[in-house]
Regions:
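Individual transmembrane alpha-helices with interfacial aromatic-anchor signatures
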Residues: 125-132
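Bulky hydrophobic segments
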Residues: 2-123, 139-193
């Protein structure tokens, strides 16, 4: 291994260190915002399969984790188009940073109240563990979209949206729409009426 390879190897560690620092920073910020580390129920689950339960957003993964995979897809596409000269690892860091910023915003009192007004009456915000799980799923989605390429990841995006609509009566697109502009018939459909 020559000097050039050694320098390149050392440079390639910086995006990974940046990711770790981002995760540490978002953890401290969420803690500062009053988020609990774990569910107040005193239990810890890797997976909660119910979309509308008191355990949703309180454990590592839940059905909404799939929407965070889709965040990763979208970030991969956008950063690939707008920052093609950046290495994929730096684009991954940008995606994880954007997702971390979203987790901080999503767990602000304003957005929690907005979700509650849009029909998520029992929603009190994510635990720190759930937010970190969401960020990890976004990173997974980014890497998966990079591996699959645009066309196949777009097909998977659409398929996941459809599956989520039938499974939990929600999806990334629907979540964004109802957060910005709640529509009564969508809220009624989501509630099962």
């Amino acid at each position: 291994m020559g000097l050039d390879a050694s320098v390149a190897d050392k440079r390639s560690i910086w995006p990974w260190l940046a990711i770790v620092l981002t995760l540490v920073a978002v953890t401290f910020q969420l803690y500062y915002q009053g988020r609990l580390w774990l569910c107040s129920c005193g239990q810890f689950f890797l997976w909660v399969g119910e979309a509308r339960s008191s355990n949703t957003s309180q454990h590592l993964l839940d059905p909404y984790s799939f929407t965070h995979v889709l965040h990763g897809f979208v970030f991969c596409w956008l950063l690939g188009w707008f920052a093609p000269r950046l290495s994929w690892t730096w684009r991954l860091w940008l995606a994880i940073t954007a997702e971390a910023v979203w987790e901080v915003i999503e767990n602000s009192n304003f957005v929690i109240q907005r979700y509650r007004e849009a029909g998520a009456l029992g929603y009190f915000g994510d635990t720190i563990v759930n937010s970190l799980g969401d960020i990890a799923m976004c990173g997974f989605g980014f890497v998966l979209a990079r591996y699959l390429g645009f066309v196949r990841s777009l097909a998977l995006f659409v398929a996941l949206e459809v599956v989520l609509l039938f499974w939990i009566r929600d999806s990334l697109v629907l979540n964004v729409v109802t957060l910005i502009y709640p529509i009564e018939w969508i809220e009624q459909w989501q509630a099962g009426y």
